[in-house]
Swiss-Prot record:
InterPro entries: HD, HD-ZIP_Homeobox_LZ_Class_II, Homeobox_CS, Homeodomain-like_sf, Leu_zip_homeo. Residues 52-116 are annotated as: Disordered. It comes from the Eukaryota. The gene is HOX18. Its main location: nucleus. It comes from Oryza sativa subsp. japonica (Rice). Probable transcription factor. It is found in: Nucleus. Signal peptide: none annotated. Residues 170-214 are annotated as: Leucine-zipper. Expressed in roots, leaf sheaths and blades and panicles. This is Homeobox-leucine zipper protein HOX18. PANTHER family: HOMEOBOX-LEUCINE ZIPPER PROTEIN HAT14, HOMEOBOX-LEUCINE ZIPPER PROTEIN HOX18. Keywords: DNA-binding, Homeobox, Nucleus, Transcription, Transcription regulation.
Length: 256
């Protein structure tokens, strides 16, 4: 009996009722409460259930709020993209314009717009003088010049960058114009040289023909008759006289 009471009290099935033992087989007793159910009263179980339902409702409400917030953020982004003309990644650029009296463009203003930083005449003069001395500033020089001009160091740095770019562009334009003029001059000189060469060739043609005719000079017959022949058989020098006959023989043996 004590074993049966202990088994029925433990229940062996917390979710359902206990088990009643009768002999060798066991049968489920749905009417008997489980030990877990016996630990808590009905009021406590209702409070636990109500708290669980309340927490689940709060999670659902917070999830709906997050979804609404994300949807609203997406709508705001799309609206801003449409208002900015399709460029949603417009950045705020810090730049300075020309070094003249109108100054340059300063730091980007609100809403992605670019505001111009108006430089006074004294500021422009001081910047130009500093650029003539040093076109690249060190960290200390940049901060000192910004303090004198009452500007930000970044603005001074950007002004010097733009000034160097403009100087390089102007120098490139000057070099291009100079090379263009040199090319035109060389082209004209080449045309003149070609014309002079054609004139020289035209004038040199008759003179070359006359010089070629003078090279072929007719030798007189007396000179031709006085040619010295060597007889290969006897190795003697024979002087031929005029008329084709032998007028005289001057033999000298070359045999050793």
């Amino acid at each position: 009996m004590e074993g049966e009471d202990l088994g029925s009290w433990l229940g062996l099935g917390i979710g359902g009722g206990g088990y009643a033992y009768g002999g060798d087989d066991c049968r489920r007793s749905p009417s008997s409460p489980s030990p877990v159910q016996m630990l808590f009263s009905q009021h406590v179980k209702e409070e636990i259930t109500r708290g669980y339902d309340h927490g689940r409702d709060e999670e659902q409400a917070s999830g709906s709020k997050i979804m609404k917030g994300e949807r609203g953020a997406r709508l705001r982004v799309m609206r801003s993209i449409r208002n900015s003309g399709g460029d949603g990644s417009r950045s705020r650029v810090l730049s300075l314009g020309d070094d003249g009296g109108d100054g340059g463009s300063g730091g980007g203003g609100g809403g992605g717009t670019r505001k111009k930083l108006q430089l006074t005449k004294e500021q422009s003069t001081l910047l130009e003088d500093s650029f003539r001395v040093h076109n690249i500033l060190s960290h200390a020089q940049k901060h000192e010049l910004a303090r004198q001009l009452k500007l930000k160091p970044r603005q001074v740095e950007v002004w010097f960058q733009n000034r160097r770019a403009r100087t390089k562009l102007k120098q490139t334009e000057v070099d291009c114009e100079f090379l263009k003029r040199c090319c035109e001059s060389l082209t004209e000189e080449n045309k003149q040289l070609k014309h002079e060469l054609m004139e020289l060739r035209r004038l040199a043609s008759p003179a070359a023909a006359a010089a070629g005719s003078q090279l072929y000079v007719q030798f007189p017959r007396a000179a031709a008759a006085a040619m010295v022949n060597v007889c290969p058989s006897c190795e003697k020098v024979t002087v031929m006289g005029g008329g084709g006959g032998e007028t005289g023989k001057s033999s000298s043996s070359y045999s050793s």
